[in-house]
């Protein structure tokens, strides 16, 4: 897959293009460009490290939305020995923006739920651009209860710009579906690990984001609103999204510092899309370590710790 470069990655794109040109020029028997290629590769490594060492919040937001970034099903295919998808909320419909089912990771049975985006126009529309409707969240709740019934740990993968705000979704109880999931997840008598793999957009993310551990990929984002939405509200100008991104504090590093994220998982140089296989292996190792720790904790203690964890985020005081 050819990389889809973001604007701030242009120096990287230029260097990689030069390397490709030299490779093509070296097809003749008398041409040896290995020395030049090695020099350019060294320069590429240094330049890439420089760029990704000092990313702004807006640049991280761009990476979180990268069209080649691995999605939930990509990670499932990488980390699971086997996976059986389950469909439908048993009330209205099957929402393709949420996927979930039963899987095994190194032989360990788990239930996995996650947001799912599309890659091309057809699948983007089918997945509703990763924005779930109420039936998606009710499908997720059905799988959560299934996990609890069979005492299987629950893994959720968060990657959505937000819950779908359409009229039909509101008529079918979008806010109730999200609120119900928040309540039920807080009381699940099983280990729950939530991982932000891309965008974490407001209540649409939180509806599968309450658990015992919150993990976040290095270039993921987690916020109450998108930078563009925030800029439109505060400054009546979506072009100020860069400023909004900084003010929102939506990066993994910032959220870890605030205590809202338990662990930040490092991504391959250039982002998860540059080496999805390596990213999947890193994610798998972290998930297994966290599961090992959580499964040793008695259920009553687990629930108490989860309650205290949620309360530690803060409380609203009326005036």
From Swiss-Prot:
InterPro entries: Acetyl_CoA_COase_a_su (IPR001095), ClpP/crotonase-like_dom_sf (IPR029045), COA_CT_C (IPR011763). It is found in: Cytoplasm. Pathway: Lipid metabolism; malonyl-CoA biosynthesis; malonyl-CoA from acetyl-CoA: step 1/1. Its main location: cytoplasm. It is an enzyme of class 2 (transferase). Signal peptide: none annotated. Residues 32-293 form the CoA carboxyltransferase C-terminal domain. Component of the acetyl coenzyme A carboxylase (ACC) complex. First, biotin carboxylase catalyzes the carboxylation of biotin on its carrier protein (BCCP) and then the CO(2) group is transferred by the carboxyltransferase to acetyl-CoA to form malonyl-CoA. This is Acetyl-coenzyme A carboxylase carboxyl transferase subunit alpha. It comes from Xanthomonas axonopodis pv. citri (strain 306). The lineage of its organism: Bacteria, Pseudomonadati, Pseudomonadota, Gammaproteobacteria, Lysobacterales.
